[in-house]
């Protein structure tokens, strides 16, 4: 006692908080010093002390103890600001959806993490005795993230599929959640409750399986005599010191350790804390230690390979059941992992990248050649360095050197000024850690309907060559050009009869109808894409009008382009300049097969001028087409008037339209008849008024197509023979039949006084026929009824125009009947007769009676983008006709530039070219663009581009141009300018299509500087207009759009746009036609413009843009759909495939452990392992040559996979704050990796192919038979491993009892009863502890005889030298692959 008192005086006084870890340390040191019994007394006193203090504290918890962190407000605000900027960038097309999602998640994750770190200091400063603070940081159950949710913010949540919801929960539980936040957080809560119930049972089951695998592993020897080890290296800072110490303490060295010439530790010495400290301070060579992996036995383990027992700190005793301890050590924390999930409920955890920050202000410099530009995963521009990059930062007085590791992103440019603590580089997270990653597909859907373009080449994936899946080779934009497609508000009707040839694409379009029940005249819009065309077309002949069905689709649109062009139709268009026929599909010459034709015919006058109410285009509806001859009769809808008035019905609603056109709104009737016309001399084989059947011979080579009554009329020089089909009735005397042409009788009217009373289902035509004077009979003929729809005024359908106050162009659809009433129609053989023609009539300014505009100029315009040519039909309304104000030869009339330098002065010198006049002329040039053609052979289609899809932008600052041209001319005084700046009045319809080309003329002295394009020498020669497309080519469009121009005898030169680069210092952006412009791009001086789109019209002071939405896509993305295809809202546009780290599963720990142990997670383990091991094997093959390389490769594969598995399992537990010693995991992993699968070839006499055998057993058998066994390393899950042991009794007691016992009986298996479980089942003594001695006596004689063969040892030594002592080689090629940041850096095993 006195001794104790004396010692107490010398004791050190510790004044610090003792938490869980400190208690552990204290206890282990007490055991070391005082032994077990004494320690338990001390701990008893500590327990009493603790309870007394806790009672005295009487801690309580109220809601007021939860203090919100003050800095939260501005942190959240800052994060919101960042997401807003991000949203904008996404809208402008600078980042794509995946990058946006990633970045917003990281922004919020960082915010939430920062709040979490603020929490502890905040409590410590404001209220250190706050019960929440005391409890949460005392080491009691629970963790910081729960407190963080109470007082910080809940942050990001996962949805049930484990995907991130990118809407964070900004409130904490103390402030209360909003409704949305509550619903989002319910995902996690529900999952937490369910998981707690499910996982508790799972954890128990996990323990059971683990114990099953390793129950037979007992310490049976002191030393197995192995010479292998696993090397652990403290150097290069790859492994944190804490983990390094944990790995080494309690292990046994496999090799002597030298420090220079001096040996500081010998083989088989166990490592204590002192030795570890020496290793750390000296930083010696890698330390080779013995682990359960290196032990040479199959079914047991030796003391030295196991190391110290964690219970008492000495080497493990013989006979200890280390297997069962290992299984329980891993399974037991599983229950804790489970319960943890409940509290955090689905809060997202994910790694963010590490940043390198600048140490001080200054200029940054690095070698440009070592980096290449790239995109970060957030879509920011950055430089990627492939090797170590040395960066210097020059501040005023000091140079800082920073080394940036390879594979990092450099976020600044060379010679850029950086501020202190600015992020200059981002180290890629996950170069060393093989964290669980998965590949995810994300689909991006189109937000609007329109036409798809892309701005780069697109590869076809080889397996999808014929489909619409394309891969992007480089980062580019996809554009959806706005424009609706044709939709009908009626239920789709089929235009096809059985076995018609039909146009495939038109049926596709019919699927997209929107059906609407209330149908009135405005909604009666059809989409007609069809054809009845069946005549043969010879290859060399141009298809003619009679054979092509001209269609204009009656849609609610003011802009359409159907078509496909090819050589034939081009010729056709050129031949009839004033008409433009657009076949929807052309004849494919290669296949020599007939394709159906249908098209819209657009008719323009030769001079390009349309008057009011003139027909712009027409369409022959195939439903109003007849093959046979007949008579047209008009009717009204009033049924009674037909019966009462036996005479003709009065005309209604006929409007004289273009002399020949009569518009009818009522139904009209077509009475078919067969007509044959013969020359006078021919002999007719039937009599007048006789009845004939079908297919009767009429003349020599003619047969009748229908049966009925024959009428023969002889006219001058020809005979006309008609056959009327129908019934013949002989009326009674009371019937009065009109003596004139005939009566139409509506359906449902019964003629009772006919001989047979009969109700007619359809309209019939009753005609009186008088063969002789007294006798007559009545022919009742079938009638085909047609209803003509009312013309729709399309003006109401145009959206309000953005380009001017209102859209003053109107299109009306008018149907008119081509033939007059009662007119007989003669059809010539094999052609069809069009009864009704549908026209598109152009009108404007109907509201203003006194409008001055009488004519509109029309022209075709092509806009080409990336080889896809769209033709637009352009209609300009001209407010006033332009006439020359002076004579042509009067020089003062056209001299725009006079001697005076003042611009305003000479702008007014020419009234025609005066600037004000041009401005006025442009501003009064109101027009609508209509897209029309598409020179793309694949897809005929109709698109509507209304004026609301375009917008005008401007004005540009055009003042510079005058001066520059003037100055350039001053240098060369010989030039006499006749006409300078400004468009030519004569080509008015193209005034808007000169982009920045101004026509200027002069003597050809400066020809070298300008591009000479066109010489117009004769009068009335055609001037072509040229357009630039996106790639800067100049197009000469189709000749049908040329305009005849009464030009002067002048030389015209085009100014090439390079000219501007030479002369204009302050030039505006040169905008070419068809170019795509992103939102927020500065074009003119008055700031950025607000919409993105494609340039359609370039004018002197403004441009018109068709609005479009850009979507960014990165390489490897899959694009759905074809170039130029029409997409609808919600169609899939792009699919991105991206890797994301698996979001920490809501149940964080247990499922992961189970997945790893059951070797179930297919992606992560096997992918990474294969990648790593491929690399190894390559190198080894190079070093050792093929046969040895493969042999060692197999062993290395196993070793490598073992180490990787251990690290994975440890990572899961460490992330939960659970400490498990590596050796427990190693014992388990050793069991699941110790089996191999026998391959087909070789050794069939010992093992069956596909049999699972132990690795060591295979090696031994091979040595005994002096023959090699072919096998493949295999990872078994713990369930399979427990069903593949040497004891069938233990297998049967685990699972599938009947199956296992039956199999064992069939094979005649023997159970050697080596494990615990078999003996328990049978009731024998279990071979552990005291009961294991019996087994030892038998095997004593084999104790330490290593199996030796000279060859093998020689080989092992050599290989060891090559592999593991060639330091340079090792470090360069292999170590890079296997160092693992947070875990042990195991190196392959040493054989020395």
Curated annotation (Swiss-Prot):
Predominant location category: plastid
Subunit relationships: In plastids the minimal PEP RNA polymerase catalytic core is composed of four subunits: alpha, beta, beta', and beta''. When a (nuclear-encoded) sigma factor is associated with the core the holoenzyme is formed, which can initiate transcription.
Name recorded for this polypeptide: DNA-directed RNA polymerase subunit beta''
UniProt KW keywords: Chloroplast, DNA-directed RNA polymerase, Metal-binding, Nucleotidyltransferase, Plastid, Transcription, Transferase, Zinc
Cofactor(s) the protein requires to work: Zn(2+)
Record has Isomerase as a keyword: no
Catalysed conversion reaction: RNA(n) + a ribonucleoside 5'-triphosphate = RNA(n+1) + diphosphate
Family membership noted in the UniProt record: Belongs to the RNA polymerase beta' chain family. RpoC2 subfamily.
Keyword Transferase part of the UniProt annotation: yes
SUPFAM superfamilies: beta and beta-prime subunits of DNA dependent RNA-polymerase
Enzyme Commission numbers on file: 2.7.7.6
Cited CDD domains: RNAP_beta'_C
Residues involved in Zn(2+) binding: 224, 295, 302, 305
Family annotation (HAMAP family): RNApol_bact_RpoC2
């Amino acid at each position: 006692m006195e001794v104790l008192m004396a010692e107490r005086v010398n004791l050190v006084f510790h004044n610090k908080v003792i938490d869980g870890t400190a208690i552990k340390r204290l206890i282990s040191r007490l055991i070391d010093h005082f032994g077990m019994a004494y320690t338990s007394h001390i701990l008893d006193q500590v327990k009493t002390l603790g309870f007394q203090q806790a009672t005295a504290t009487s801690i309580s918890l109220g809601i007021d103890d939860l203090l919100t962190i003050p800095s939260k407000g501005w942190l959240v605000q800052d994060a919101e600001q960042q997401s807003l900027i991000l949203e904008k960038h996404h809208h402008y097309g600078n980042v794509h959806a995946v990058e946006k999602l990633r970045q917003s998640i990281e922004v919020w994750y960082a915010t939430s993490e920062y709040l979490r770190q603020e929490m502890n200091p905040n409590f410590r400063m404001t209220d250190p005795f706050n019960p929440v603070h005391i409890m949460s940081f005392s080491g009691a159950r629970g963790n910081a993230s729960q407190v963080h949710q109470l007082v910080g913010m809940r942050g990001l949540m996962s949805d049930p599929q484990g995907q991130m919801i990118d809407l964070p929960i900004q409130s904490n539980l103390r402030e209360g959640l909003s409704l949305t936040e509550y619903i989002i957080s319910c995902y996690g809560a529900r999952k937490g409750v369910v998981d707690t119930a499910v996982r508790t049972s799972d954890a128990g089951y996990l323990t059971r399986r683990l114990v099953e695998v390793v129950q037979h592993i007992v310490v049976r020897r002191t030393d197995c005599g192995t010479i292998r080890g696993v090397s652990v290296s403290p150097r290069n800072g790859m492994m944190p010191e804490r983990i390094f110490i944990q790995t080494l303490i309690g292990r046994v060295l496999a090799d002597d350790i030298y420090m220079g010439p001096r040996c500081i530790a010998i083989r088989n010495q166990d490592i204590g804390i002192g030795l570890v400290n020496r290793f750390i301070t000296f930083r010696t060579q890698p330390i080779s230690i013995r682990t359960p992996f290196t032990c040479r036995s199959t079914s047991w383990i030796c003391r030295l390979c196991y190391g110290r027992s964690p219970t008492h700190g000495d080497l493990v005793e013989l006979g200890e059941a280390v297997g069962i301890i290992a299984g329980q050590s891993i399974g037991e924390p599983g229950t804790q992992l489970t319960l943890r999930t409940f509290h955090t409920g689905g809060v997202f955890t994910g790694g963010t990248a590490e940043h390198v920050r600048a140490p001080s202000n200054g200029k940054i410099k690095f070698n440009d050649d070592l980096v290449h530009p790239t995109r970060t995963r957030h879509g920011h521009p950055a430089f990627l360095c492939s090797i170590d990059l040395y960066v210097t930062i020059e501040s005023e007085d000091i140079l800082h050197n920073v080394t940036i590791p390879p594979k990092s992103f450099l976020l600044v440019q060379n010679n850029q000024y950086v501020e202190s603590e600015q992020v200059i580089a981002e180290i890629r997270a996950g170069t060393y850690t093989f964290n669980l990653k998965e590949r995810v597909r994300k689909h991006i859907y189109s937000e609007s309907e329109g036409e798809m373009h892309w701005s780069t080449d697109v590869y076809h994936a080889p397996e999808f060559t014929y489909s619409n899946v394309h891969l992007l080779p480089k980062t580019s934009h996809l554009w959806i050009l706005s424009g609706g497609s044709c939709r009908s508000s009626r239920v789709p009707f089929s235009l096809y009869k059985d076995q018609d040839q039909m146009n495939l694409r038109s049926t596709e379009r019919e699927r997209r109808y929107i059906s609407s029940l209330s149908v009135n005249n405005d909604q009666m819009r059809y989409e007609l894409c069809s054809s009845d065309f069946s005549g043969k077309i010879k290859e060399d002949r141009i298809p003619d009008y009679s054979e092509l069905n001209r269609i204009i689709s009656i849609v609610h649109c003011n802009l359409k382009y159907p078509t496909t062009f090819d050589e034939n139709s081009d010729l056709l268009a050129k031949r009839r300049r004033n008409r433009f026929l657009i076949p929807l599909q052309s004849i494919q010459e290669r296949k020599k097969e007939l394709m159906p034709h249908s098209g819209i015919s657009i008719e323009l006058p030769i001079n390009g001028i349309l008057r009011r109410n003139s027909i712009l285009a027409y369409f022959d509806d195939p439903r109003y087409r007849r093959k046979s001859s007949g008579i047209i009769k008009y009717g009204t809808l009033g049924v009674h008037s037909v019966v009462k008035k036996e005479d003709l019905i009065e005309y209604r609603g006929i409007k004289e339209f273009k002399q020949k056109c009569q518009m009818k709104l009522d139904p009209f009737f077509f009475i078919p008849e067969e007509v044959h016309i013969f020359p006078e001399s021919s002999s007719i084989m039937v009599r007048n008024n006789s009845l004939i059947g079908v297919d009767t011979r009429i003349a020599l080579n003619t047969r009748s197509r229908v049966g009925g009554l024959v009428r023969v009329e002889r006219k001058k020089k020809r005979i006309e023979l008609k056959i009327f089909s129908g019934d013949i009735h002989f009326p009674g005397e009371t019937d009065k039949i009109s003596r004139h042409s005939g009566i139409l009788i509506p359906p449902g009217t019964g003629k009772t006084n006919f001989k047979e009373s009969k109700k007619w289902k359809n309209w019939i035509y009753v005609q009186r026929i008088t063969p002789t004077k007294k006798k007559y009979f009545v022919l009742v003929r079938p009638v085909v009824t047609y209803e003509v729809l009312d013309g729709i005024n399309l003006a109401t359908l145009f959206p309000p125009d953005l380009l001017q106050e209102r859209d003053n162009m109107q299109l009306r659809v008018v149907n008119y009947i081509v033939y007059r009433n009662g007119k007989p129609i003669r059809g010539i053989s094999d052609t069809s007769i069009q009864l009704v023609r549908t026209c598109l009539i152009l009108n404007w300014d109907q509201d203003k009676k006194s409008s001055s505009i009488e004519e509109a100029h029309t022209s075709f315009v092509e806009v080409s983008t990336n080889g896809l040519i769209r033709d637009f039909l352009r209609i300009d309304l001209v407010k006033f006709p332009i006439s020359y104000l002076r004579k042509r030869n009067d020089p003062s009339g056209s001299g725009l530039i006079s001697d005076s330098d003042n611009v305003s002065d000479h702008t007014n010198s020419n009234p025609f070219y005066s600037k004000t006049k041009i401005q006025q002329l442009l501003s009064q040039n109101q027009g609508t663009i209509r897209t029309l053609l598409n020179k793309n052979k694949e897809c005929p289609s109709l698109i509507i581009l209304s004026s609301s899809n375009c917008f005008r932008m401007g004005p540009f600052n055009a003042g510079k141009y005058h001066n520059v041209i003037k100055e350039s001319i001053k240098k060369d005084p010989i030039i006499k300018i006749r006409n300078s700046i400004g468009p030519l009045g004569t080509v008015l319809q193209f005034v808007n299509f000169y982009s920045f080309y101004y026509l200027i003329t002069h003597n050809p002295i400066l020809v070298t500087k300008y591009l000479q394009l066109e010489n117009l020498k004769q009068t009335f020669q055609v001037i072509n207009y040229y357009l630039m497309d996106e790639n800067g080519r100049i197009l000469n469009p189709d000749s049908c759009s040329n305009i005849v121009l009464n030009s002067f005898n002048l030389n015209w030169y085009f100014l090439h746009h390079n000219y501007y680069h030479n002369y204009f210092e302050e030039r505006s952006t040169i905008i070419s036609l068809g170019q795509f412009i992103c939102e927020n791009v500065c074009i003119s001086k008055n700031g950025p413009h607000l919409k993105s789109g494609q340039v359609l019209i370039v004018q002197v002071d403004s441009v018109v843009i068709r609005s479009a939405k850009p979507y960014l896509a990165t390489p490897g993305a899959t694009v759905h759909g074809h170039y130029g295809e029409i997409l609808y809202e919600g169609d899939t546009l792009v699919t991105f495939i991206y890797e994301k780290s698996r979001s920490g599963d809501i149940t964080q720990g247990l499922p992961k452990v189970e997945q790893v142990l059951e070797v179930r997670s297919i992606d992560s383990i096997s992918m990474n392992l294969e990648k790593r091991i491929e690399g190894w094997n390559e190198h080894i093959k190079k070093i050792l040559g093929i046969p040895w390389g493969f042999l060692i490769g197999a062993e290395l594969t196993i070793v490598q996979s073992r180490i990787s598995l251990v690290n994975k399992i440890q990572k899961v537990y460490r992330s939960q704050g659970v400490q498990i010693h590596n050796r427990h995991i190693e014992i388990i992993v050793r069991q699941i990796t110790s089996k191999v699968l026998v391959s087909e070839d070789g050794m069939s006499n010992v093992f069956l192919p596909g049999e699972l055998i132990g690795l060591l057993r295979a090696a031994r058998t091979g040595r005994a038979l002096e023959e090699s066994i072919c096998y493949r390393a295999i990872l078994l899950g713990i369930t399979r491993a427990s069903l593949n042991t040497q004891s069938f009794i233990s297998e049967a007691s685990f699972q599938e009892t009947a199956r296992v016992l039956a199999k064992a009986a069939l094979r005649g298996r023997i159970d050697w009863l080596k494990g615990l479980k078999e003996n328990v089942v049978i009731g024998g003594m279990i071979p552990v502890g005291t009961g294991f001695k019996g087994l030892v006596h038998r095997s004593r004689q084999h104790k330490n005889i290593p199996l030796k063969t000279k060859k093998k040892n020689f080989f092992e030594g050599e290989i060891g030298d090559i592999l593991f002592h060639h330091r340079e080689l090792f470090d360069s090629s292999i170590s890079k692959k296997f160092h693992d940041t947070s875990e042990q850096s195991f190196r392959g095993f040493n054989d020395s």
